[in-house]
Design a protein with these regions (language model features):
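Extended alpha-helical targeting/anchoring segments
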Residues: 1-301
């Protein structure tokens, strides 16, 4: 597709780091494992870990008086939504995920913001990346897994459908039932699941792509409709080719994907950069990998 609003020359489109040493921290048992072939680095890190660490403490969150500038005004946002609904009614598209951006000056470091999010809105695929040499940092509180590949099997867990938690267990249950029965929420979710199943089918054995589970998952502040889809990779495919088939995620684009990517480019009028991309890792030897979708994301430059 031909894009009207392309990244400027010099803009980062993605970053890949080849990692030969790293630290794995298990949240379940609070243990750390140092993985490297460099014994000097291992000794240095293990010695640092063994030292008594001062707990990281957060001060009261300061007030940000800087103006937040939206990419679209509320009026423009409503007008664009009406255009999208008309395009759906005309049969041009089935689903479009239109986003807005807010720009402002930070009064705290991205690292501190990430710690605040871990406390206020913990999410299973949260991400913090700091690359001072490249001039950017990413903070994401993402609940969504785009792709996991392990031992020849691939998994994706698309999210579409959201409601509040409510103020009580009874409220939460009622809101959940309303969301489950909502025709719009279920229709959007079905379309998304069909899209992701089709993407996986391109790299998986015939008949192996199935929905393992469809459920409501509860997070700190919201409830989501989530499907878990699994497939068995063809012998000639791997995690990288699966990623190429499934990226960008359907939940942040829409369907049909090629058409809606052109529509999104037209209505958002700027590149999305890292937001709605993915952060993750891939084993270059086995092809095993895990990638999230960078939603609920802050990009600092």
């Amino acid at each position: 597709i031909a894009l009207q609003h392309v990244p400027e020359e010099g803009d980062l489109l993605g970053v890949l780091w080849l990692i030969d040493k790293y630290i794995v921290h298990s949240n379940e048992d609070d243990l750390m494992e140092v993985i490297t072939n460099n014994n000097d680095w291992r000794s240095l890190v293990e010695n640092e870990i063994s030292q008594e660490q001062r707990p990281f403490s957060l001060i009261e969150q300061p007030k940000n008086d800087y103006l937040e500038i939206p990419s679209h005004t509320d009026k423009e946002h409503i007008e664009i939504l009406e255009r999208i609904k008309q395009s759906i009614a005309d049969g041009q598209v089935y689903q479009v995920n239109f986003g807005r951006f807010w720009t402002s000056k930070l009064i705290e470091s991205p690292k501190v913001i990430f710690y605040r999010l871990l406390k206020s809105n913990p999410a299973p695929f949260s991400t913090y990346i700091s690359a001072e040499d490249l001039g950017f940092a990413i903070v994401s509180s993402s609940p969504e897994s785009l792709l996991k590949c392990q031992n020849g099997f691939v998994h994706t867990s698309p999210i579409k459908g959201t409601c509040e938690r409510g103020n009580s267990i009874a409220d939460e249950k009622e809101l959940r039932e309303i969301m489950i029965e909502d025709v719009k929420e279920r229709s959007e979710h079905r379309m998304l699941v069909d899209l992701m199943r089709n993407d996986l089918s391109a790299v998986c054995e015939v008949g192996s792509v199935n929905i393992e589970r469809f459920d409501v998952e509860t997070y700190s502040n919201v409830q989501h409709l989530v499907s878990h889809i699994k497939g068995k990779l063809l012998p000639e495919e791997n995690g990288l080719t699966a990623f190429n088939s499934i990226f960008p995620g359907g939940s942040i684009t829409g369907c049909p994907r090629t058409m809606v990517c052109a529509v999104i480019d037209e209505i958002e009028m700027q590149p999305r950069s890292f937001w709605t991309g993915s952060a993750g890792w891939i084993d270059v030897h086995s092809g095993d990998c895990s990638w999230n979708i960078l939603i609920r994301t802050l990009q600092a430059t």
